[in-house]
Structure formats: structure tokens, C-alpha cells
């Protein structure tokens, strides 16, 4: 492939976001014609990283639901995309709202990392083994609800901040254990800190967890370099999960888990929503055989169906009051 004009990559300024964007930067540069084994300068020239500080990064002392939701991690980046200051953005898919601003699309999803939630503690090996009344640190309503469903005696400690900040709070004794995405730990070279994992069938992760996604302007979705970084299997699975997210009107005020697995043409899926206190859980699971006509649309429709069934069962009980 001949060299193309540079593709400017927008990314949050956090260590994890820059690590994730750096992983994609080399792949994008290669897709643009930069040879394997090229120097960092050559890669940077073809696909420069443009760090952008978001509102979600600046405000660290409150839950996302209190300050505007997931969109606070993407607002400034999406404005830069629409203004033409950057050409694409790399995000953690789990942080993306169910609906995007007009003119923007999720254009490519590469191979997924480990989607599980990691349990980290100096007290014990597993969530189930925590002492009665132990403090569990998380800012995720889903992780809170799933943990309380298993262990209603736990005290939930609000723990926002980047991965290093959360680990430091654990070291200082502000919590007895914390839950983090294993994918983020792996990308930061911290996977060895995990003591165990939440069972992804019993506690499905957030829709899209473990997957990165490249967001572009709608008119750029057919660019050849995007095709070079797409993973069909991941794209189909996350289409189902995000379909469920949309049906459940997912936000930071709803505790939603979804896990889809593609095996050949068979797509299986678990979707659940819980009340914020974990006392009630509404769950649906099933599988379909994809026809091959439009696998992504079929997967999304499957997710929408299961999500709608969970929404009908849970009603307003699954939404945290404002």
C-alpha cells in the first residue's frame, strides 16, 4: 500500500489511554504504508498522537453519573473530530455512550483483550472471601451492584481516578479490595497484580469491555486503512453487546452487564441489569445462528431483543434515581 497523508489520532491524556492509542498508532501507521520495524519517528510522522484532556479526566472526586456521564470522556475529543483537528480517536469501547453525536461513527474495532473484571486485594484471593463488612473500591455502578448481589454485607467505597491512583488508594488502605478491567491492567503491564477474576458468566462485564474502538467522521468510514485494523469476530460480538446497551438506555445510572461470544456462526449472549443495591437481578441469555447476510446487523438486533426483554422485566427499578 502506498503512503497516505498522516492520520492524526486523538486520545485522552491518561497513561492508559496513551498506551492504548500507542498500540493502535503502530497498526494504523503500518496500514498507511509504514513498513514493519520502522522507527518511532516514522510511525509518529504517519500517525501522530494528539493528547486531549477531557472533562472526565479533570473531575476526579465524583461519580460520572453526578457530573454528566460517560460523554465527559469523549466530548472534547469528538469536538476535535468534528472540527477537523484530528482524523480519528481511539477509545475504550466500554466508555462510549450508546448513541454518538451526528456525523461520527465507530468505524473499526480491533481484536479484543481480556474482557473480565480483575479482583485486586492484599486481604484475600477472591471477592467471595472478603471479610464481613469489608470495603470494596469502585466507581462503577455495575461492579457495585454485581458485588453486592454476591456479598450484600460489603461497604462500597467510591474510587475514581486512573489505574495508578486507584492502586495507590488500595495501598494506603482506603479499600480492602478493588475491581479493575483486566484489559487495562494488561495494556499497562500490570496484569500480574490480579488475584482472581469475576466469573464473566456470573458477572458479565460492561458492554464492549476489553475492546478498543476507532471513532471517525461518518464520511471516512470506508477508508482502506480502517479495514486493515478491523477484527470481524470482535466487531460482531460488541455489536450485540451495544445493541443491548441501547435497548436498556444504558448510562452511568444503570448497572448493565453484557457478554457475547461468537463461535463460528453461533452467537451466544448474556445480558443482565441489576438494581443499584444488587438486591434484584434481571437476566436473559440465548443464542442465534448468523445467516451471513449481514452479521453485524443481525448481532445488533439480537442484542436489542435481549436488552429489551431485560428492560421490560426490570422497569424503573434498574435506574438509579437522580
Swiss-Prot record:
EC number annotated for this UniProt entry: 2.5.1.61
Keywords assigned by UniProt, alphabetized: Porphyrin biosynthesis, Transferase
One GO term of the biological process aspect: protoporphyrinogen IX biosynthetic process
Keyword Transferase assigned: yes
Any Gene Ontology CC annotation: cytoplasm
InterPro entries: HemC, Porphobilin_deaminase_cofac_BS, Porphobilin_deaminase_N, Porphobilinogen_deaminase_C, Porphobilinogen_deaminase_C_sf
Gene name of the record: hemC
Name the record gives this protein: Porphobilinogen deaminase
Note: The porphobilinogen subunits are added to the dipyrromethane group.
